[in-house]
Amino acid sequence: MKLEPLFDLDPNVTVRTRFAPSPTGYLHVGGARTALYSWLFAKHHHGEFVLRIEDTDLERSTPEATAAIIEGMEWLNLAWEHGPYFQTKRFTRYNQVIDQMIEQGLAYRCYCTKERLEELRHSQEANKEKPRYDRHCLHDHSHSPDEPHVVRFKNPQEGSVIFDDAVRGRIEISNSELDDLIIRRTDGSPTYNFCVVVDDWDMGITHVVRGEDHINNTPRQINILNALGAPIPTYAHVSMINGDDGQKLSKRHGAVSVMQYRDDGYLPEALVNYLVRLGWGHGDQEIFSREEMINLFELEHVSKSASAFNTEKLQWLNQHYMRELPADYVANHLAWQYRDLGIDTANGPALTDIVSMLAERSKTLREMALSSRYFFEEFETFDETAAKKHLKAAAVQPLEKVKEKLTALSVWDAHSTHEAIEQTAADLDVGMGKVGMPLRVAVTGAGQSPSMDVTLAAIGRERVLARIDKAIAFIKAKAA
């Protein structure tokens, strides 16, 4: 029954998948994993990936949510060959198909009032029958098409819908369980389940990867596709993601928005690697490059069971990628964190140096940015615990002595500053810690930092000397 095709599809493409979010909120991690699985399956089979925005819920859909979804997909580097397509721009197409279905007896107008449908439902419930439409209007020709009505799909009454789910195996639903679905509302707008069918048909979708919450929609959609004479895609319904307490993942478990993970300082490679393993695996392997994911991914290896989100595992992966990815790439993502925090990095070390110094010490880029402010801007106060422990009267002499050594350096680098600290300790006949720890608190404001030689070299001579003076003044003011 296909009308003129609206898309110029490459006949040589044998696999075409889609990700079809509703723009009623952000891109959450469950949706991101679905998109990733769909994308990987297409890439594995040298196919195409379509992005479709299912925005038929006019009251809840927003341009901001659409922008957030696209931003999330781009951040995860899940590029699409086609789209984004918007269902609200295809209403003419949907109604063309509905009108032709009415002409061919595949669908019919229903003029039943809300009151009649309520009475029918109460009657069926009283008789312990499953509530369903009784086809009162199927052969009723007493109404004018101009009267308010919905359009219902004429669902088969006999037999079953059987499909082989790529994740869950064979699923069978009796047609007696299915109603005559409304496919066009009284206001003339097509309904979600119908739009999805026409889109998958028009866009040549061969494999539909989506959440298990869509399983009940599948038999209805298959029946409509069969009525249209359209090919049936392979369906794959992936399990839900739970929190580590076994409950459905929600905000109380922490971040659920993809872009919140960006904001919290995770690299996209870490989140993608984590999500791919959240329901799929290849032996005991934990770390996967993008190329390995594409080469190894198959829907048959996706678990039917719900997965538990573990933030500690994600942090472990994030640390791995912060260490292993090129420093300039990590630095580009780190730069976003500094901008978001309002930290001006113009006067300070190269961000690649920050990555080299702090990648081993930080779980996230956010933590890295927050713990490295002292490289770029002055601090007002010292960490209270660190100052109480190390900025005491006994620290004045080591600080004054090391300042003399540092001031006299002809070359300011990690090697020279290390020698200055070492020589100060030797001159005072004390351990390195008696010099290094007060110096660390003096120049960073905190009790923890990378090794002092690289820290001093990165902060710069002028700032270091001024901060030592500030620490000495702080100690003397306390003692006064």
UniProtKB/Swiss-Prot annotation:
Short sequence motif named 'HIGH' region, residue ranges: 21-31
This protein's cofactor list reads: Zn(2+)
Enzyme class, UniProt record, top EC level: ligase
User: Which domain of life, per UniProt?
Assistant: Bacteria
Q: Which GO terms describe its biological process?
A: glutamyl-tRNA aminoacylation
Entries under Gene3D superfamilies matching the protein: 1.10.10.350, HUPs
Q: Where does Zn(2+) bind?
A: C110, C112, C137, H139
Q: Where in the cell is it found?
A: Cytoplasm
The record's remark on the cofactor is: Binds 1 zinc ion per subunit.
Catalytic reaction annotation: tRNA(Glu) + L-glutamate + ATP = L-glutamyl-tRNA(Glu) + AMP + diphosphate
Query: Record-annotated residues binding ATP?
Result: K251
The record places the motif ('KMSKS' region) at: 248-252
Q: Which UniProt keywords apply?
A: Aminoacyl-tRNA synthetase, ATP-binding, Cytoplasm, Ligase, Metal-binding, Nucleotide-binding, Protein biosynthesis, Zinc
* Pfam families, alphabetized: Anticodon_2, tRNA-synt_1c
What's one GO MF term for it? tRNA binding
Q: Which SUPFAM superfamilies match?
A: An anticodon-binding domain of class I aminoacyl-tRNA synthetases, Nucleotidylyl transferase
E.C. code: 6.1.1.17
Family, according to the entry, reads as follows: Belongs to the class-I aminoacyl-tRNA synthetase family. Glutamate--tRNA ligase type 1 subfamily.
Its function?
Catalyzes the attachment of glutamate to tRNA(Glu) in a two-step reaction: glutamate is first activated by ATP to form Glu-AMP and then transferred to the acceptor end of tRNA(Glu).
What is the protein name given in its UniProt record? Answer: Glutamate--tRNA ligase
Origin species, per record, is Actinobacillus succinogenes (strain ATCC 55618 / DSM 22257 / CCUG 43843 / 130Z)
